[in-house]
């Protein structure tokens, strides 16, 4: 399904989401550092997985944004 959203609104939404994803990624990097300092492997694994998903999402959003240009 295609929604009726102007290119300007799409671009703003994508840019806002990229910013939010970067902030979320930064928080996960901090969580990873804390977990590494404590030797908490479960949190290390989760933060590492979260970072990979966030990086992928950023790439998808950036590609969509580039397609609008």
Name each model feature, range by range.
Residues 1-23:
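Short, charge/polar-rich alpha-helical segments
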Residues 19-69:
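Short, charge-rich amphipathic interface segments used for partner binding and complex assembly
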């Amino acid at each position: 399904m295609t929604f009726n959203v102007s290119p300007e609104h799409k671009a703003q939404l994508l840019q806002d989401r990229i910013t939010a994803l970067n902030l979320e990624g930064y928080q996960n990097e901090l969580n990873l550092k804390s977990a590494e300092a404590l030797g908490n492997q479960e949190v290390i694994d989760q933060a590492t997985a979260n970072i990979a998903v966030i990086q992928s999402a950023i790439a998808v959003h950036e590609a969509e944004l580039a397609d609008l240009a």
